[in-house]
A protein has these predicted regions:
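Short, flexible helix-loop junctions that flank or precede catalytic/ligand sites
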Residues: 1-251
Length: 251
């Protein structure tokens, strides 16, 4: 805002104002968050991402926080995303409809190969479901390799790669190396463009299981977006085994 610094919280999907403070405090406020989030406090012209860990003294839990800094006409806008850092939520506790969960196991996760797309708007729990599915598939006789931007949950026993464009560790440079790691299951944090979509298709065609997320409103939208990326329809039909679209319901 032009004259004030507004603090808002999103609870159960509803964004509301918590407090409005004097704009004079904005610089000190943002600099402190930048320091905690390991961002560059001198950089005010470009968008940045950061990461911090906060200890909740009342419960003794560590809370993982992703920091997003966005440059606006009135200064820097900061969004903090809280991540659950405790043990992963088992799939049967995510509260899917029983029939949906049963089909997700039988028609997707238990198949030997193919692409599994988890879709939905931002903030609908796609990442939580993705990690729960990966944790379900994780076993001593399977090689699971990931490319994520960034790694949000650590799962013991799998090879997780956190991408970093600053050192040229991108999807483009990482995906060829994944195929040399003898993976049974490949996890891509998100399909963002035609390159990552084609990489997922090629991996599935060679007998791998691929799990990833996609920003679309529904299941049909996921397939249409793949087609808009100029992926041939017969390639989509022969590799995509499941599309799971989800929403979060308010308590």
């Amino acid at each position: 805002m032009k004259n004030d610094l507004r603090i808002r919280f999103r609870c159960d999907g509803v964004l509301g104002v918590y407090k409005t403070i004097d704009k004079k405090l904005a610089s000190a406020f943002t600099n402190r968050i930048k320091i905690l989030g390991r961002a560059d406090i001198a950089e005010r012209r470009h968008h940045q991402d950061g990461h911090m860990t906060f200890e909740d003294t009342s419960t003794g839990r560590n809370i993982d926080i992703r920091v997003s800094i966005y440059i606006t006409v009135y200064g820097e806008k900061i969004v903090l995303r809280l991540l659950r850092k405790t043990q992963l939520v088992p799939l049967d506790q995510i509260n899917m409809f029983p029939r949906t969960l049963s089909r997700f196991y039988e028609d997707a996760l238990d198949l030997p190969s193919g692409i599994i797309l988890i879709t939905g708007p931002t903030g609908t729990g796609k990442t939580t479901t993705l990690y729960s599915a990966v944790n379900y598939l994780n076993s001593i006789d399977r090689c699971v390799t990931t490319a994520e931007d960034p790694v949000e949950f650590i799962i013991e026993g799998i090879a997780q790669c956190s991408l970093n464009s600053k050192i040229d560790l991108t999807f483009e440079t990482t995906l060829p190396y994944i195929m040399r790691q003898d993976p049974d299951i490949i996890v891509l944090g998100e399909i963002r463009d035609r390159f990552s979509a084609e990489a997922a298709i090629q991996a599935a065609l060679t007998g791998h299981k691929v799990l990833t997320t996609f920003h679309t409103e529904d299941t049909t939208g996921a397939l249409l977006r793949l087609m808009n990326m100029n992926i041939e329809t017969f390639m989509i039909a022969s590799t995509v085994v499941a599309v799971l679209a989800q929403r979060l319901l308010r308590r």
